[in-house]
Amino acid sequence: MEPREAPSKLKRSKTMLTRTSPALLTKPNVATEDAQYFEYTSSANPIGAKLISRVPFCSFSPSLYADGATRVVPLDLSAELGCPGPATGPGLSANFLRINAGDALTLDPNATSQVCYVISGAGSVQQSETSFPFSMGDFFTLPGGHATVLSAAATATLYYVNDAPLLTYLGTTGVHARFAPTRYPAAEAQAALRAVAEQANAGRRNRISVLMGNTNFPQTRTVTHVLWAMFGIVPPNSVQKPHRHQSIALDFIAGGKPGVYTLVGTELDRDGNIVNPTRVDWKTGMAFVTPPGHWHAHFNETNENAYVIPIQDAGLQTYLRTLDIRFAHQG
């Protein structure tokens, strides 16, 4: 009797001889129909290739919220950015809020982080089981995931930034809070800034400012894990030299007389001055966008202090190690 081939070998042999059906070869494959392939050098810089838009420079007047009904005023640049709105940058949405006395306004974005600065007025905040008062000059932060009700005891206006556009881009919902609602009272924030401004070497620093922090984010020293909020002063008759960073800055002007301005541009000359800058004249209550990577310097040609509040996505950028903040060196 001739020896039989082992069953396992027979099985492998049959498998090797099996051919793909010609009908299957011509059938569309759903798993690959979205696949694309691009030549590297023409695709590695989509901004340079004009496949994606640059962050536009823009300013927003305080007249947008000076009067009228209780409302949210989105500072919306989504058309220029080519993304769903409202969005002021690719990952952030800045807004003015107006809440008339006796009214309430509900905020419930799909966001991880929300920051408010109280421009004027007073009222209260309620998010889930947490409630606290607010008044002019306060900062406060709110996590996402729960609706927040802002009630005005006196007509209130606020500057409000969240990261909803980032979550829209990521396609994510169901936020898990990384921090609790947190208030930074005006008196404490102003005292912290005053202490920094009175230090002997303050005038030699690139900026005279304090960063709002939260104990949950010791690595980034930022107000939330995504957002950075800075409270800065530009003293009378002073210049704050150029610096740049890869985070977008959504700047709010909390105080300043005519004669205070910012110069913004993409390049420095050999002396550390901005080449062909755009000038932004400050007006109390306005906001403006400083695009990522742009050099910017502040000038105060008046005899009074001026105040600026930049809110950025620098919490996230710092954690990703991509902030790349640089300071001009001038003679």
Predicted regions and their residues:
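Intrinsic, low-complexity N-terminal interaction/targeting segments
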Residues: 86, 91-96, 105, 114, ...
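Short, low-complexity cationic-aromatic patches
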Residues: 28-32, 85-88, 103-115, 130-131, ...
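Double-stranded beta-helix
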Residues: 153-213, 224, 257-288, 301-331
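Conserved metal-binding segment of the jelly-roll/cupin
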Residues: 133-154, 161-164, 280-302, 311-313
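A short, N-terminal "cap"/entry segment at the start of jelly-roll beta-barrel domains
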Residues: 9-89, 171-231
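A short beta-strand-loop-beta hairpin characteristic of the jelly-roll/cupin
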Residues: 104-136, 253-284
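Conserved short histidine dyad/triad with adjacent acidic residue
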Residues: 75-83, 93-110, 230-246
